[in-house]
């Protein structure tokens, strides 16, 4: 039985490594490349973070690189919290103060914004983390700390009725939904899926 979302990536990277996994206006990333990049990011985070199953904020523009960062957080044994880089800085600061994340990983495009939060949590650059050589032993130890009922990600509500609330979703919930959804819709490896929703919007995880 599948227990971790990363198993989807790992199985696919072995089966069709050179097939494009994600494409944006600037970059095409194969499943092999996505696997390598996310493991490198996971290694960089895992070496610096003392514990697992903690929230790690991902602050970046919507891109292939952000996908690698989200998966990299999972490889580090933690769960990701995507925030919209277009949010007002005051809102981001309020969410960080509420969440108290283990770290924030950001892209170069939002480096100045991320730097303003340096007093709230450790900061990691996605671009620098991408240069990290994956450490299989470290990644294995991180994986062993995570159960299928542990969080995979957290999405904040809009806060229209007050302070935004964090909704936690486990690996098991996403696995069960994904297996049902792909069978019900009849998605195959030949299909190409598009996404227009921000990564911090919950519709992204149910309507691709």
Model-derived regions, located:
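Carrier-protein-dependent adenylate-forming modules in NRPS/ANL systems
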Residues: 1-175, 185-186, 208
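Gly/Ser/Thr-rich phosphate-binding loops and adjoining beta-strand/alpha-helix segments
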Residues: 55, 190-194
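Short glycine/serine/threonine-enriched helix-capping/active-site loop
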Residues: 69, 195-196
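Short catalytic-loop micro-motif centered on adjacent basic/acidic residues
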Residues: 82, 194-195
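Conserved N-terminal segment of class I S-adenosyl-L-methionine
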Residues: 177-181
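Residue-level detector of conserved catalytic or cofactor/ligand-binding positions
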Residues: 202-208
């Amino acid at each position: 039985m599948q227990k971790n979302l990363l198993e989807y990536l790992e199985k696919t990277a072995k089966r069709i490594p050179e097939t494009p996994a994600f494409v944006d206006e600037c970059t095409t990333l194969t499943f092999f490349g996505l696997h390598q990049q996310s493991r490198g990011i996971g290694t960089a985070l895992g070496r610096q973070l003392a514990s697992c199953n903690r929230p790690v904020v991902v602050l970046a523009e919507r891109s292939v690189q952000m996908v690698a960062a989200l998966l990299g957080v999972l490889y580090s044994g933690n769960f990701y919290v995507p925030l919209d880089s277009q949010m007002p800085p005051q809102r981001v600061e309020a969410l960080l103060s509420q969440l108290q994340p283990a770290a924030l990983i950001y892209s170069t495009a939002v480096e100045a914004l991320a730097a303003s939060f340096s007093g709230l949590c450790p900061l990691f650059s996605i671009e620098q983390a991408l240069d990290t050589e994956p450490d299989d032993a470290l990644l294995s130890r991180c994986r062993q700390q995570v159960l299928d009922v542990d969080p995979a990600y957290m999405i904040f509500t809009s806060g229209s009725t007050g302070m935004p609330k964090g909704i936690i979703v486990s690996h098991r919930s996403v696995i069960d939904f994904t297996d049902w959804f792909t069978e019900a819709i009849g998605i195959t490896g030949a299909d190409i899926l598009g996404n227009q929703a921000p990564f911090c919007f919950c519709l992204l995880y149910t309507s691709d």
